Amino acid sequence: MSHLADALRAATTAVLMGSFACLASTTAAADPNTGNSSDVNTLAGNLSKGYGLNNCTAQPITGSQLAALTCGQSPDPNGPVQAKYFLFSSGDDLANWFKTSIKDDVLTTCGDSSTKGPAPWHQGNATTNAGQVACGTYQDGAEIIWTTDAKNVLSYIRASTTDVPALYQWWRTNG
């Protein structure tokens, strides 16, 4: 009987230790600095084609950000090498972050626009503005930075080259 008692005691200890390990890992994975899961999921619904929570990571939020996601290389080999997405609590905060995010870029025209700098963009065939878009380069990489005003989302994609027109075309197709 003592062998059975020892075996039961060892099994109980193993189960308890495993439960504590699972509990500790769940607590460690929950990071309050990345916002709540509802906001992260809302933001994830606004990612460019090919990106999702399977290849983007929640980042610590600051100020008026509700959620932030950083993504690496697009699954599309012609796509960006990096993307970042931010969800804000208000349109004013979105506009301020947009202005701040483009201030160090060398701005160029976007596509067939004649404007160097921020310009309105339209989603699909819509005639109403969806937000602002800016195209340019920063530290030897092309960048497209845009807002989706109705959703308070700021988005950013970056290429490994300075080919702004190619990145802009990718964005128009997949953005």
Predicted regions and their residues:
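Secretory targeting and sorting signals
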Residues: 1-31
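Extracellularly exposed regions in secreted/surface proteins, prominently low-complexity, repeat-rich
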Residues: 17-18, 30, 35-41, 127-175
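N-terminal "mature-domain start" segment
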Residues: 31-68
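Stable alpha-helical elements in mature extracytoplasmic
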Residues: 39, 43, 47, 90-98, ...
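Sec-exported extracytoplasmic/periplasmic mature domains
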Residues: 48-53, 89, 93, 99-106, ...
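Short Gly/Thr-rich strand-loop-strand
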Residues: 62, 102-145, 171
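Exposed beta-strand-loop-beta-strand "reactive/processing" segments of non-cytosolic proteins
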Residues: 67-77
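A short acidic-to-branched-hydrophobic micro-motif
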Residues: 78-98, 153-158
